[in-house]
């Protein structure tokens, strides 16, 4: 049911309920000044298709307040509903089920209306401007610039980019932000790792630093640094390798710039773009961390104990107070996070969403407590969080734990290339991997990583990603789109068909249960998008697309499209064209391509 139809039916049912309630309560209630307030009408699709198209339980909710039997009440509501002129073109029939469920069947014309809506609106179908004028900052990935992006970052990138698209579909202006943790212990470890490689050491050698990173990429950084190469991140200043093995600060700056560039390349391969990169180091250089700490001290939110500065996080629901500044004068890792979120608020983002790994769960209360303690108007519960669990990579039935690039973990680029069909070991020669392989891999990785709820662990099966059959969910959905393209191309060539003529097709020809079910699924797309945005649940789009592809395949297997009779042929072509458009729209939400041939 389309949103406009749903709103109309809800209004008709609400009016019917008021009529029945007034008749039951009579003038006594009115004379006593008792206003009857009906509950909000909730419409759902019945779990069993035979029960109709729409179900409502309002009679069971109101039976007790109105002092009547729920089934009898349902009969009165249905009688009032079907008597209304507005319902006669929308509702074909109504029946009472069980203790008082109202099951409605929509008219054929009401079901068919979705085809015209999709064909008229095209890529805009399903979107809304209900949140127009509102801004959202969505922070995701936010990796340390100490190595290539790993599969956990990949899950964040897929979830974040898809969620940004879904939220934007409701009218929000979405600002995508990447927070670079370019300050702290990890950056120091990166510098000494690169320095050790520049001196000719390798993992396992005497003198190799215990905290050093072992990936081969460190050797590449050291080589380019010693050779005087110049590197730059997309938003950064060029940094030239000094070639001085003793200048640790120069090594650090070069290594950070090198890895920021590499992460930019990872994100480009993944099809993810950001509006802004925010550097943690800038919070220190601009004095924002100190300013935030001073403000919390002045607000009475801190105390000294054992030589450390503590934040009263228990005031905001944390299980214990937390150290802000250690006895050696350094800050704990959540302190710059508080300062960073102050900048988000000061930049006018009253709605902020962070996508992070579930290992960050403990920082939520600390960051929120710090923000509340500043007393600058930030609401409780700011920011929102989407936490995701880990990803395990499997190939040939075995877990893959390391890669040639990173040494100790699987990178996003590994996953893209393997899922696109690159042979094991081919990542060592990336110039030999063509764009088609990257596209296939990117589509598979993005769809797979979005296809489960964020708070569930995910097993990424490389072998499944390579299958070209119904077991592979992204192939299943993309194949539905490609098959429709093929049928419509044949319809054009064989019958001189024009897509522009499809809105005039006689849709009354669509009489089969499979056609009705497919149209019903198409009509659910706008409400599904709204739900996905409200619940911060981009996986709902992946679930929907699999269901839509299934409905299409059921229809296609049950009915021939290219029949001799023009009227049913064009009606079925119109249904296919609408289905193709919604598949394309949904795949675009996930950042996945909609191929015309496979």
From Swiss-Prot:
GO molecular function annotations of the record: arginine-tRNA ligase activity; ATP binding
GO biological process terms, semicolon-separated: arginyl-tRNA aminoacylation
Signal sequence residues: none
Chain location of the short sequence motif 'HIGH' region per the record: 143-153
One Gene Ontology cellular component annotation held by this UniProt entry: cytoplasm
EC assignment: 6.1.1.19
Compartment(s) where it occurs, according to its Swiss-Prot or TrEMBL record: Cytoplasm
Catalytic activity: tRNA(Arg) + L-arginine + ATP = L-arginyl-tRNA(Arg) + AMP + diphosphate
InterPro entries, per the entry: aa-tRNA-synth_I_CS, Arg-tRNA-ligase, Arg-tRNA-synth_N, Arg-tRNA-synth_N_sf, ArgRS_core, DALR_anticod-bd, Rossmann-like_a/b/a_fold, tRNAsynth_Ia_anticodon-bd
Principal subcellular localization: cytoplasm
Keywords for this protein: Aminoacyl-tRNA synthetase, ATP-binding, Cytoplasm, Ligase, Nucleotide-binding, Protein biosynthesis
Family as reported in the entry's similarity comment: Belongs to the class-I aminoacyl-tRNA synthetase family.
Subunit structure, as described in the record: Monomer.
NCBIfam families reported for this sequence: argS
HAMAP family: Arg_tRNA_synth
Full protein name: Arginine--tRNA ligase
Organism the protein comes from: Burkholderia multivorans (strain ATCC 17616 / 249)
């Amino acid at each position: 049911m389309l949103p406009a139809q749903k709103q109309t039916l809800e209004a008709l049912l609400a009016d019917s309920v008021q009529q029945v309630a007034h008749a039951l309560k009579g003038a006594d209630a009115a004379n006593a000044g008792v206003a009857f307030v009906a509950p909000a009408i909730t419409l759902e699709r019945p779990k069993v298709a035979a029960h109709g198209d729409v179900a409502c339980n309002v009679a069971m909710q109101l039976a007790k307040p109105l002092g009547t039997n729920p089934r009898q009440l349902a009969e009165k509501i249905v009688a009032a509903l079907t008597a209304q002129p507005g319902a006669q073109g929308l509702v074909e029939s109504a029946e009472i089920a069980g203790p008082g469920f109202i099951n409605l069947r929509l008219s054929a014309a009401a079901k068919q209306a979705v085809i015209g809506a999709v064909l008229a609106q095209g890529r805009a179908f399903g979107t809304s401007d209900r949140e127009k004028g509102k801004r959202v900052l969505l922070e995701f990935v936010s990796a340390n610039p100490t190595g290539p992006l790993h599969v956990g970052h990949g899950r964040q990138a897929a979830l974040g980019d898809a969620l940004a698209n879904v939220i934007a579909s409701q009218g929000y202006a979405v600002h995508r932000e990447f927070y670079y943790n370019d300050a702290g212990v990890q950056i120091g470890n990166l510098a000494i790792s690169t320095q050790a490689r520049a001196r000719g050491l390798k993992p396992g050698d005497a003198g190799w630093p215990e905290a050093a990173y072992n990936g081969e990429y460190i050797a590449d950084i050291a080589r380019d640094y010693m050779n005087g190469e110049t590197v730059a991140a997309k938003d950064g200043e060029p940094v030239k390798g000094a070639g001085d093995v003793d200048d640790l600060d120069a090594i650090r700056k070069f290594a950070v710039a090198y890895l920021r560039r590499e992460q930019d390349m990872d994100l480009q391969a993944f099809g993810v773009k950001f509006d802004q990169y925010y550097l943690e180091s800038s919070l220190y250089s601009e004095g924002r961390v100190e300013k935030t700490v001073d403000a919390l001290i002045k607000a009475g939110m801190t105390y000294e104990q054992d030589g450390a500065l503590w934040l009263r996080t228990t005031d905001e629901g944390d299980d214990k107070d937390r150290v802000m500044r250690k006895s050696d004068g350094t800050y704990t890792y959540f302190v710059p996070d508080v300062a960073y979120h102050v900048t988000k608020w000061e930049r006018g983002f009253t709605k902020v969403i962070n996508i992070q790994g579930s290992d960050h769960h403990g920082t939520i209360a600390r960051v929120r407590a710090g923000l509340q303690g500043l007393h600058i108007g930030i609401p409780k519960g700011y920011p929102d969080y989407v936490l995701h669990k880990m990803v395990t990579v499997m190939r040939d039935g075995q877990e893959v734990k390391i890669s040639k690039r990173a040494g100790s973990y699987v990178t996003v680029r590994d996953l893209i290339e393997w899922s696109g069909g690159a042979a094991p070991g081919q990542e060592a020669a990336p110039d030999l991997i063509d764009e088609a392989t990257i596209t296939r891999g990117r589509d598979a990785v993005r769809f797979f990583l979005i296809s489960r709820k964020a708070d569930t662990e995910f097993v990424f099966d490389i072998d499944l990603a390579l299958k070209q059959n119904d077991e592979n969910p992204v192939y299943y959905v993309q194949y539905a789109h490609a098959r429709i393209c093929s049928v419509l191309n044949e319809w054009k060539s064989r019958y001189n068909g024009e897509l522009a003529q499809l809105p005039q097709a006689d849709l009354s020809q669509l009489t089969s249960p499979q056609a009705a079910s497919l149209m019903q699924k198409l009509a659910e797309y706008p409400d599904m998008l709204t739900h996905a945005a409200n619940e911060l649940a981009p996986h709902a789009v992946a679930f929907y697309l699999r269901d839509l592809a299934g409905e299409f395949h059921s229809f296609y297997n049950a009915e021939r499209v290219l029949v001799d009779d023009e009227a049913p042929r064009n009606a079925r072509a119109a249904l296919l064209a609408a289905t193709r458009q919604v598949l394309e729209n949904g795949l675009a939400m996930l950042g996945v391509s909609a191929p015309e041939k496979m």
